[in-house]
Design a protein with these regions (language model features):
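Bacterial Sec-dependent N-terminal signal peptides
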Residues: 1-28, 208-212
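Outer-membrane beta-barrel channels and translocator barrels
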Residues: 20, 61-63, 73, 112-116, ...
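Short glycine/proline- and aromatic-enriched beta-strand/turn motifs that initiate or cap beta-hairpins
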Residues: 20-53
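Residues that define the transmembrane beta-barrel architecture of outer-membrane proteins
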Residues: 21-23, 46-50, 97-103, 117, ...
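Residues on the lipid-exposed face of transmembrane beta-strands in outer-membrane beta-barrel proteins
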Residues: 27-33, 52-60, 70-72, 103-109, ...
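Solvent-exposed loop/turn segments connecting transmembrane beta-strands
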Residues: 28, 40-45, 115, 193-201
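Extracellular/periplasm-exposed beta-strand and loop segments of Gram-negative cell-envelope proteins
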Residues: 35-46, 75-100, 130-166, 170
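Predominantly the C-terminal beta-signal and adjacent terminal strand-loop region
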Residues: 74-81, 157-160, 164-212
Length: 212
């Protein structure tokens, strides 16, 4: 709860800043791929995922602005895991879906062009909190599904969930038109997804936004 409070407090500060200067609000949609990285990521494969939310651009000078907002971001990966059943042991494919509320805290650098748009380069940290998700394992004709975050009970055993809190670094580039933006964002997680694993999130999204 303390981590959620910190995220909400950060957004409140951004909104307070927005009330004191001329800002740009936008609705944004991103489509892309996510996977895991790190020593224990193994042969993880990417999944198609998306994010959607509200963005805020707060001008600091003619060339620099502060960008934040609140997004629903889906991440995850497909990975091979060992499954031990009653009479067998198999390597099976597990799809992990992780849904976060995510808040970026970015410095944006605006570069004018001869055309009718600006180039915008962004970089900075992000904070995220996992709110939902499922882990699905296909075993022959059977699908075993349990929660991504929080504990689950399978065959009488308690299975730990992934850590809810995530933070990392974002970087991106976008074309900024009068009413629209299009761009590419990369998100590189710095927090371990579980206490006994060194895997971290990795995601790339093509984004489009409408400014109002």
């Amino acid at each position: 709860m303390k981590k959620i409070a910190c995220i909400v407090a950060g957004l409140f500060v951004a909104l307070t800043m927005a009330a004191q200067t001329k800002v740009t609000w936008s609705m944004e949609l991103g489509l892309g791929m996510s996977t895991w990285m790190g020593k224990d990521a193994g042969d993880s494969s990417p999944l198609f995922n998306q994010k959607v939310g509200v963005g805020i651009d707060v001008p600091l000078s003619g060339l620099v602005s502060f960008q934040t907002g609140l997004y629903w971001a889906s991440k995850g990966a497909s990975i091979d895991v060992d499954y031990v059943g009653a009479n067998t042991k198999n390597v099976v494919d597990m799809h992990v879906n992780q849904n976060y509320f995510e808040m970026p805290l970015l410095a944006a650098f605006h570069v004018g062009t001869a055309a009718n748009f600006d180039m915008v380069f962004t970089a900075g940290p992000y904070l995220a909190y996992g709110v939902s998700g499922k882990r699905n394992i296909d075993i022959d004709d059977l699908t075993v599904s349990y929660n991504t975050f929080g504990e689950s009970k399978i065959d009488g055993e308690i299975v730990s969930g992934l850590r809810r809190f995530d933070a990392g670094v974002m970087a991106g580039v976008a074309l900024d038109f009068k009413r629209w933006t299009v761009g590419l964002d990369g998100e590189f997680g710095c927090c371990k997804l579980a206490s006994n694993s060194k895997t971290r999130n990795l995601a790339f999204f093509f984004t489009a936004g409408y400014k109002f």
